[in-house]
Each structure stands twice: as C-alpha cells, then as structure tokens.
UniProtKB/Swiss-Prot annotation:
Pfam families: Ribosomal_L44 (PF00935). Binds 1 zinc ion per subunit. Coiled coil: none annotated. Binds to the 23S rRNA. GO terms for biological process: translation. It comes from the Archaea. NCBIfam families: PRK05767.1. One of its GO terms (cellular component) is ribonucleoprotein complex. HAMAP family: Ribosomal_L44e (MF_01476). Zn(2+) binds at C11, C14, C71, C74. This is Large ribosomal subunit protein eL42.
Amino acid sequence: MKYPKQIRTYCPFCKRHTIHKVERVKKRPRSELSAGQRRFRRILKGYGGFPRPKPEGREKPVKKLDLRFRCTVCGKAHTRGRGFRVKKFELVEV
C-alpha cells in the first residue's frame, strides 16, 4: 500500500487542519530492567514450566501498522484511529 508522506488533517492540539508528516513507528526492544520484566524473570527461575498457559488460536499473519501524524505547526504527534493490517507499506511523495 502506498501512503502519502504528508497529509492535511485535523490537529487536536492546534484545533485546526494543518499539514502533518506521517511517521511509521517501529516496536522498541523491551526494557529488561522494568518491574514487570524483573518479576517475570524471577517467576521463570528454578524448576517448573512456563507461568502462563499457551495462547489459544493462531498468530495473525500480519501486524497492525502504527502510524503517527506529526503537526508541522506545533510539532506534536498524534494517532488517527486504529492501525490497519497490510503486508507491504510504503510512504511516497505526492
């Protein structure tokens, strides 16, 4: 899917329609020092199996896109609705 690099859309911070730059956000690596991750590592230690049951069903073939729209006037970024599933994604100059 081809998507424009810049679009004119509503900015909730400026409260008006402005030009926005479109950014695709990648998943960052997990923080190994967060409280939840430290607790999880502690549970995994020693004998015994995994602390949670296996998830039901199957893995989805494609992840949802995480698009951020950054306002060129105020510089703040926001999302617009939920992400959508697409195999190929490309930002193009219009």
